[in-house]
């Protein structure tokens, strides 16, 4: 029989218990066979790679880490080994976080441990925080390309060359899988030359088309709602209304309040003269504001009861669109073709641009 003193002496010290915990000595077992450079475990045999052969403790720790991570799986025949310094960082972190060092400095123990099990391993300064179990952070390197065209003399030629470089990959050839942000600044004078008056016409026509589309869209939505209400009334007259139909009718009634309620909320347009005056005011505005949307709604309410004026307004909108295309063609020349084609490879893009006098 062992005496009490002998039993007490055979127990591991606190420092040894800490080492057992950090290196996961139990309950995971791995036998190192130096002659064959393998590790034999209850879950399979693992071959030690060359960069771990001089550091068997690191190899054993990593294999035990895999067994702990997947307790119900066998070890794969081909193990994906990290760099040795990643395992060293993991062991160091486990030392520093151990409860034994709650009020102590672990640096002395860490230095002694590294000299014992990882002597000669250099840890890059930028990799000191890389440990096992951390998701790899991928950083997309964004290449910024900025071009500015302000000279009206050679602008067309320079733009044609610029788009050609984008198309053939000259500007984006060294991305190495990263992202590319292209920023192009083209002055109106460089792009349109002396056609500043045409540019003003284009801006005015764009404004007319935009206002026209908003007003006509509101009119179309109201007409669609009214058509649905009419069908609902016919179903009510024939006695074929169902519970679902009643719910739909209530929803349509709620939606149709959008334009009708504006007659009581804002001053409605009552005459044709006031309608065209409101439209001209919208065309002359240089900036957008919430009040302009209300004016568009008033115009839409007026057009709902004046179909002939609606037809005239629609024709004017279409004419403005046609004039915009004509002005654009005159400013840019006989051909302006810009096409974008998406590709699976971030380094590739298809951009075609042509400028001709």
UniProtKB/Swiss-Prot annotation:
Transmembrane segments: none annotated. Pfam families: Rep_4 (PF05797). InterPro entries: Rep_fungi. Coiled coil: none annotated. Residues 226-257 are annotated as: Disordered. One of its GO terms (biological process) is plasmid partitioning. Keywords: Plasmid, Plasmid partition. Plasmid partition require REP1, REP2, and a cis-acting DNA sequence (known as STB). REP1 may act by intercalating in the yeast nuclear matrix and binding STB either directly or via REP2. This is Trans-acting factor B. The lineage of its organism: Eukaryota, Fungi, Dikarya, Ascomycota, Saccharomycotina.
């Amino acid at each position: 029989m062992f005496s009490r003193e002998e039993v007490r002496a055979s127990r591991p010290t606190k420092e040894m218990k800490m080492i057992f915990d950090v290196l996961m000595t139990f309950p995971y077992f791995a036998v190192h066979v130096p002659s064959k450079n393998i590790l034999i475990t209850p879950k399979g045999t693992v071959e030690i790679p060359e960069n771990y052969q001089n550091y068997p403790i690191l190899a054993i720790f990593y294999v035990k880490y895999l067994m702990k991570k997947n307790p119900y799986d066998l070890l794969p025949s081909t193990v994906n080994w990290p760099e040795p310094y990643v395992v060293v960082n993991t062991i160091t972190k486990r030392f520093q976080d151990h409860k034994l060092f709650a009020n102590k400095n672990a640096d002395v123990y860490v230095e002694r441990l590294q000299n014992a099990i990882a002597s000669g391993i250099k840890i890059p300064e930028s990799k000191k925080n890389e440990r096992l179990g951390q998701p790899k952070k991928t950083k997309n390197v964004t290449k910024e390309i900025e071009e500015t065209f302000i000279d009206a003399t050679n602008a067309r030629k320079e733009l044609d060359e610029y788009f050609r470089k984008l198309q053939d990959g000259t500007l984006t050839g060294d991305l190495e899988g990263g992202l590319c942000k292209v920023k192009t600044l083209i002055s109106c004078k460089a792009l349109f030359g002396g056609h500043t008056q045409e540019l003003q016409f284009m801006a005015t026509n764009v404004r007319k088309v935009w206002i026209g589309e908003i007003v006509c869209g509101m009119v179309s939505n109201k007409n669609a709602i009214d058509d649905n209400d009419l069908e609902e009334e016919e179903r009510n007259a024939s006695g074929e209304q169902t519970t679902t139909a009643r719910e739909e009718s209530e929803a349509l009634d709620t939606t149709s309040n959008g334009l009708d309620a504006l007659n009581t909320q804002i001053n409605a347009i009552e005459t044709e003269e006031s309608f065209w005056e409101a439209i001209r005011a919208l065309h002359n505005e240089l900036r957008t504001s919430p009040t302009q949307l209300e004016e568009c709604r008033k115009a839409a309410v007026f057009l709902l009861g004046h179909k002939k004026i609606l037809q005239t307004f629609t024709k004017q909108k279409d004419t403005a669109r046609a004039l915009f295309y004509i002005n654009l063609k005159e400013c840019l020349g006989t051909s302006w073709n810009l096409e974008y084609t998406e590709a699976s490879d971030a380094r590739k893009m298809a951009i075609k641009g042509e400028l001709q006098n």
